[in-house]
């Protein structure tokens, strides 16, 4: 069978930043996408097979203007360009489920990206990404799994348009290429479920923000060589009569590799802005068929604010409470405090 989609979005955006040159941004975005996929299910004596073939096409056009920010008053125009981001991807995925409890999933995707602000200032970025996933059911409650895949992340139009030399398009910014490895275990009962996952991610040309003195408060972007991330994630759900409890914990170490900037060797330094630990707890009460209460707490651990790891930002908590009630059959009223 075939499954297709189409969407269109329009955004009109105005922002004021705390600096003069280019400090007022006007953006009108037109974004649409379409795609289709063909799925075929085949049943054999000892396995079930699913084959998926698909194609996607996305087109984003940003009419971006910048003006001088004269203490909140729009001044002279400093940038006026129509930016384009066009993506086309084709993919194939094959999945087989065996009666022994083994599941195998593998696929490949080829993607072409055309990015720029006119026909003479376009760059082409393409990538072939394979993936492989294996899982095995040990019994009715336990499942182990492994996955490998590569990923390809292009710079966004916002990242490309913020160029320190003022030309409005940073052709030196490259795509981020990553390899991801994951191994884990799941256990599920009627009222409780656990999942534990260990992962390793290596990347080249990772894109990170930075600031320069002339434009304090404005982010520019650059590639940082390579990075190495590893971590452990634990997720659990407890179901009870009146609702459920969700728990999620992440422990990670995210480091630069082979990265020298302004004469400083940042190899083995921690990537700034990423906490080493995070804990999320959600308590969801179903007060009645139409009323729900959600209590959630998020603990963000310590992280560094700079590449040299000289400034440490302390941990903090975010607590949210939300109450919602269905007022009509297809509408809901909610109120919350953060």
Task: Please provide the spans of the model-predicted regions.
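C-terminal beta-signal and adjacent terminal beta-strands/loops
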Residues: 204, 299-306, 325-338
């Amino acid at each position: 069978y075939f499954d297709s989609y189409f969407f269109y979005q329009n955004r009109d955006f105005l922002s004021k930043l705390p600096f003069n040159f280019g400090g007022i941004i006007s953006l009108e975005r037109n974004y649409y996408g379409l795609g289709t996929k063909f799925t075929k299910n085949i049943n054999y004596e000892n396995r079930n097979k699913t084959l998926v073939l698909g194609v996607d096409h996305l087109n984003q056009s940003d009419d971006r203007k910048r003006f001088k920010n004269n203490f909140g008053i729009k001044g002279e125009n400093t940038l006026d360009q129509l930016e384009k981001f066009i993506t086309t991807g084709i993919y194939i995925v094959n999945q087989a489920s065996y009666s022994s409890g083994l599941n195998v999933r593998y696929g490949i995707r080829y993607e072409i990206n055309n990015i720029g602000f006119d026909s003479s200032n376009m760059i082409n970025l393409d990538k072939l990404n394979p993936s492989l996933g294996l899982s095995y059911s040990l019994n009715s409650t336990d499942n182990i799994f492994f996955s490998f895949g590569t990923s390809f992340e292009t710079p966004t139009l916002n990242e490309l348009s913020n160029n320190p030399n003022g030309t409005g398009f940073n052709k030196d910014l490259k795509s981020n290429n990553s390899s991801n490895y994951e191994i884990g275990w799941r256990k599920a009962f009627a009222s409780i479920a656990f999942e534990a996952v260990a992962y390793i991610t290596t990347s080249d040309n990772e894109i990170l923000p930075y600031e320069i003195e002339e434009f304090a408060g404005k982010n520019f972007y650059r590639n940082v060589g390579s990075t190495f991330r590893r971590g452990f994630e634990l997720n659990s759900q407890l179901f009870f009569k009146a609702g459920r409890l969700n728990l999620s914990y992440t422990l990670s170490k995210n480091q630069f590799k082979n990265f020298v900037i302004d004469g400083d060797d940042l190899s083995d330094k921690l990537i700034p802005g990423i906490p080493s630990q995070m804990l999320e707890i959600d308590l969801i009460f179903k007060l009645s068929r139409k009323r729900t209460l959600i209590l959630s707490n998020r603990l963000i651990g310590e992280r560094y604010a700079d590449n040299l790891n000289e400034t440490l930002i302390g941990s903090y908590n975010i607590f949210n409470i939300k109450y919602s009630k269905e007022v009509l059959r297809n509408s809901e009223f909610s109120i919350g405090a953060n």
